[in-house]
Amino acid sequence: MGGTLAIQSHGDLTLAQKKIVRKTWHQLMRNKTSFVTDLFIRIFAYDPAAQNKFPQMAGMSASQLRSSRQMQAHAIRVSSIMSEYIEELDSDILPELLATLARTHDLNKVGPAHYDLFAKVLMEALQAELGSDFNQKTRDSWAKAFSIVQAVLLVKHG
């Protein structure tokens, strides 16, 4: 059932939208560690309890997080995983990749509310980082792409 949902959702994302997402993601990956670190700092600002899901980073200030090796390593892992998902947006393998992420998140008690917050913060971070390149087409493309990812994660959520 989850695979069917994902495959149907793939059809909703046009080739042009996939190109926009991939192009802007490649722009962001020039500074991947700082982009993803700032993304998590934004998440922790909205939901300080979310920071406690990372015991090695619990209680750190934003400036401490920016220089933390643990945060930098996590940022690299997240950027690599996101890069993989973005490259596989039109692939039937995407649901399997996301199933692994959903299982990991379930173990760490990360669920639908966290996915919603991530979506909100991702859009804010994209706008801040891309500036004028974050136009309506870019916004719509990212929103649709993340909704595909989120739909699969929710289906796979324990």
Curated annotation (Swiss-Prot):
GO MF: heme binding; metal ion binding; oxygen binding; oxygen carrier activity
Pfam families (alphabetical): Globin
Top-level taxon: Eukaryota
Keywords: Acetylation, Heme, Iron, Metal-binding, Oxygen transport, Transport
Gene3D superfamilies recorded: Globins (1.10.490.10)
Listed InterPro entries: Globin, Globin-like_sf, Globin/Proto, Mb-like_M
Post-translational modification N-acetylglycine, affected residues: G2
Residue sites binding heme b per the record: H74, H105
Segments forming domain Globin: 12-158
Disulfide linkage: none
PROSITE patterns: GLOBIN
Family: Belongs to the globin family.
Quaternary structure, from the entry: In the oxy-form exist as a dimer, it disassociates into monomer in the inactive Met-form. Upon deoxygenation it aggregates into tetramer and higher oligomers.
Protein name (record): Globin-1
Organism of origin: Paracaudina chilensis (Sea cucumber)
